[in-house]
């Protein structure tokens, strides 16, 4: 009698997850474990049981590829349709392009840093489950950069300012803000990297980035950007889960971890809040059709959601970040202060700025009844009047940069919106300047790291931001022109005033051809 074949019992979700994570691990014998994993102890974090780390999604690599493949098929169908049907002409206004340029120049390259960071963290954690989770997030972030590039590349065919992203990333002054954020995280230990990216950014602050950009894209007819946002949304839910799982895992492992984690939370909340001031400007000024104000977004996603999170973490001994109160007060001011900064330095930015219309000023007055009319409307109207007289304001001097966040000193003192916030520290006979108490404290804890900051303004003054062969002693030398050529700007096309720009003229002409006989 022949033996009957018996179907093998399929593994359940828990068993499959264990098989595809911890089942892949082994105890090293050729080298001691501390030599194989040299970085998971030097930050002072104590881990007693790596098996306590469990991914609530229990996602394994075979399932991961299946889900991502399905999403990619849908995404690239939309991208192709958008390109074939001239979807770029369906956006509300060519001013919206500046928001996408800012995202492409300043946010998308950060994805590459996060890829490197999670790949490294996955290599240096001893726990198999944490390594697999970090590996999948590294692949996620690589995919996000690729889909953003493929979605936005269609705009590069028709409009200025989308070119030379990698070249600009290492050189342009305002891009040093996200670049320094990413490099600070990337040069941290693996646990600090998790708190910086997975917790502080992905869990606490990510909605302040993705909701404004993706909702703004939907409101303004940019279906290509909306689609890559939706395609990334399910990934972001896993990333947020990794963030909360990471911090709770660290806090539950040993009481000695609490003060270390608290210091990281203080640091990275403030660094993230400063970085997102660029998003606040975009929300309040760059979207022709607005979703909500920065103030409203901060109240929902930071104060309500973040406040509930820190109340939950209080049982572990974690308090709200040191900069919490100052960041909440700044919600009334930062978007206006950053917009005015970029308006005046618009000649040195690879996107356009403009004077808001009367309707847009009225909208801002209703959204910021306590501050806008008192502090910012008069300045904007003054600049608009000068522009109408043919005296468009461009700053030709260089601003002082904060050593930590690298934003020009444009923010004001907490409690006094009429006074620029300015702090100084002398370290080894050198003077360092900061925009706030919190940036100064971050420097004070890691001075040897931040004295190495590559500050664009300082580098320009040192003569390090000119193309080879440029002679600064020549009689006709124009330093601003030389720096912008070093940035690889197409002068008069990528930068400057929106009104009368090539992007404005082309969009109007192409829209007219598409909608008229």
Q: What name fits each language-model region?
A:
Residues 120-132, 154-159, 187-189, 211-231, ...:
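Inter-helical turn/loop segments and adjacent helix faces that build the functional surface
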């Amino acid at each position: 009698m022949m033996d009957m074949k018996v179907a093998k019992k399929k593994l359940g979700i828990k068993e499959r997850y264990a098989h595809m994570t911890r089942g892949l691990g082994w105890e090293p014998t050729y080298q001691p474990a501390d030599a194989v994993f040299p970085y998971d102890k030097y930050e002072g974090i104590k881990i007693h049981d790596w098996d306590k780390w469990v991914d609530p999604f229990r996602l394994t690599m075979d399932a991961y590829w299946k889900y991502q493949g399905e999403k990619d098929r849908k995404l690239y169908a939309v991208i192709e349709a958008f390109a074939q049907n001239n979807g770029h002409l369906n956006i509300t206004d060519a001013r919206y392009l500046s928001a996408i340029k800012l995202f492409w120049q300043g946010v998308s390259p950060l994805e590459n840093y996060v890829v490197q960071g999670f790949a490294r963290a996955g290599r240096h954690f001893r726990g198999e489950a944490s390594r697999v989770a970090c590996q999948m997030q590294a692949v996620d972030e690589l995919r996000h950069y690729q889909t953003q590039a493929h979605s936005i590349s269609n705009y590069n065919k028709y409009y200025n300012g989308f070119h030379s992203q990698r070249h600009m990333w290492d050189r342009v002054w305002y891009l040093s803000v996200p670049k320094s954020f990413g490099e600070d995280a990337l040069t941290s230990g693996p646990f600090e990297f998790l708190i910086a990216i997975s917790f502080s950014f992905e869990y606490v602050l990510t909605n302040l980035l993705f909701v404004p950009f993706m909702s703004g894209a939907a409101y303004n007819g940019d279906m290509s950007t909306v689609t890559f946002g939706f395609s990334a949304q399910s990934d972001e839910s896993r990333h947020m889960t990794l963030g909360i799982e990471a911090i709770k895992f660290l806090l539950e492992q040993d009481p000695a971890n609490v003060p270390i984690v608290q210091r990281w939370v203080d640091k990275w909340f403030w660094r993230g809040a400063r970085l997102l001031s660029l998003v606040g400007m975009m929300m309040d000024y760059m979207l022709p059709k607005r979703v909500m104000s920065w103030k409203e977004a901060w109240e929902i996603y930071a104060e309500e959601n973040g406040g509930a999170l820190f109340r939950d973490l209080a049982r572990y001994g974690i308090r709200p970040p040191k900069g919490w109160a100052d960041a909440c007060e700044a919600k009334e001011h930062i978007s206006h202060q950053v917009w005015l900064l970029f308006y005046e330095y618009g000649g040195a930015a690879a996107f356009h700025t403009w004077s808001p219309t009367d309707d847009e000023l009225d909208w801002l007055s209703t959204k910021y009844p306590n501050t806008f009319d008192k502090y910012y409307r008069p300045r904007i109207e003054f600049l608009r009047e000068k522009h109408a007289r043919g005296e468009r304001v461009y700053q030709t001097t260089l601003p002082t940069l904060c050593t930590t966040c690298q934003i020009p000193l444009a923010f004001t003192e907490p409690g006094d919106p009429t006074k620029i916030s300015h702090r100084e520290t002398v370290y080894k006979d050198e003077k360092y300047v900061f925009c706030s108490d919190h940036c100064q404290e971050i420097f004070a804890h890691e001075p040897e790291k931040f004295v190495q900051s590559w500050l664009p303004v300082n580098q320009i003054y040192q003569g390090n931001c000119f193309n080879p062969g440029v002679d600064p002693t020549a009689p006709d030398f124009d330093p601003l022109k030389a720096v912008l050529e070093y940035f690889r700007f197409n002068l008069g096309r990528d930068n400057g005033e929106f009104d009368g720009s090539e992007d404005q003229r082309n969009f109007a002409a192409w829209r007219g051809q598409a909608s008229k006989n």
